Amino acid sequence: SMQLSARMTGFPKSKRVKLKYVEEIVFSSSNLIQTYSFRTNSVFDPNYTGGGHQPMLFDQYAEIYNHYTVLASMITATPAPIISTGVVPSYFGWNLSTSANALTTDFSAVTYLLESNYTNPPLIYGNNNADSGVGLRTLNVVRAKFNAADFFGVTSPLDGSAYTALCTANPAQE
């Protein structure tokens, strides 16, 4: 959910809304650790790694309200392995960090991913091709929640300008 601040008369001064954002990510089939980063507290550009689009209806709200603050967000990710024979099992997980660079520096090997207390949960999946007899049949789903007040250690993210942004920018504190 996010809080919006109005810039036009005739509308409420602020409004809480829930917006939905969907992104499809394709990784190469290398043996290397691959990471992808999202901004948990931005609706202007949630996709840190690749850039992208805003959640549905964000542009319409941005015509009425000039600032936003993300109070909470949630991610649901489902790995969809390539359907072919000989696919090796893969590890899949998430990490919440104040720096997108932490992902690439901290998780340079699978062992770091599996041993980290900050990655939750490391899942293993394999080939989803039922006819090949290779790999695992079940796809795992990772869900995680972000609460801005808890994560940043503040009473309310609405109290600090570092967590609020113009509708044309990301917050200063990402």
Stretches with model-predicted labels:
Residues 1-174:
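Capsid-like jelly-roll
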